[in-house]
Amino acid sequence: MKKYLKKSKLIRQAHKHVVHNKAKLLRTLDSFKKPNNASAWEEYINFALNNQLDKTNFVPFSNQKYSGKSSKKIIAYYLPQYYQIKQNDEWFGRGFTEWSNVTKAVPQFSGHWQPHLPIDVGFYNLETTKIMHRQVELAKTYGISGFCFYYYWFSGGEKIMEKPINNWLKDKDLDFPFMLFWANEDWTNTWGESADLGTKTYSAKMKKTDVEKFVKDILPFLSDKRYITIDGRPHIIIYQPIKDPYLPTFIKEIKNKIQQAGINKPFISLVFPDTFDEDFDPRNYGADGAVEFGAHLKTMPQEIKAQTTNEKIINPLAKLTEYDMEGYINSDQINPKTSYPLFKGAMTYFDNTARKIYTGAQLFEISPELYQKWLYKSLENSSTDQVFVTAWNEWAEGMHLEPDHKYGYAYLQATRNALENFENKK
């Protein structure tokens, strides 16, 4: 097992990062608004330059491997955007990956946790499965039962970022369950700060001619013995249930095609919509259930939302909204009642400053302790045996179970704590 980094070594590495990036950071800060209060500006500068050195809340690696046998399985969403693809090269410059956004982020106010920087796994490249073996080792150690890979498949059969999941399929030494999360939304270059780098759009609006192509592409995954199932039925998640009028027909047809291929009819879950529409029922789309993906933002009680003040944010161009997640997690909003199977979820943290600070970033400050509470409640209230965590490695949005400079392995440890506490209560 790869030896984890000790605090002293982490501090030295963090110090190197601070020194290396000091000039770059100061150039960035020159464009920020300096408060009238000189001491506030000095406080911010000191924080921005030294926040990676603070190991107050750092949790080290645990050699004790999870050995429980819970009735609930925790599955973490997995982002594959950690290698070069031609679309990102064309739109954002050669060599662009998720790490390009992660490393450019800076704090927007004193106390703002940015950037999020990985330890243990480092700034990995998913061109090969080398780092995946370490990811599996970490996941198993802390009680995670599987990865749910985002799968980018578009009308006409075009695919993006498919190499990691294809490599996973080929590497049979990766003895760990997995499944597909079909990210069926149009894909353009506009998710970043710029919208003028290209015009190519990959459409997720399905047509009848897409059915056979889609089924042909996913059959190798569904037939793999590691694929996650529900009562023997391969589980597939679909992201956007309400934006494609053809989707109900598409779901019905792919179910039939998959069954005709000799595989059990898939269990299809739709992402529970942010609108939290009480009339929403996945069965109306031909699906079997729904899955939670983060927080139900649009119906979050107004008192839980908190717009950051101009006095707090140093960057005059920043657009950032904070949410009181403790209030949300303690509210009834976290446990909606449905007549259909709803796969509960929890979120580690969320801060998409690295991607959206000038177009409307959101900040959900969720400490490891608060995340543990949320996950425990999801385990306790779930009527299904699968609970989903957002996310394993969405670093540019601050959602990562993977260890980081600030908290170390705290979110992984919180995952195991929640699972063990749930087991011990039964």
Task: Identify the meaning behind each predicted range.
Residues 1-54:
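Membrane-proximal basic amphipathic "stem/tether" segments
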Residues 33-426:
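Glycan-processing catalytic domains of CAZymes
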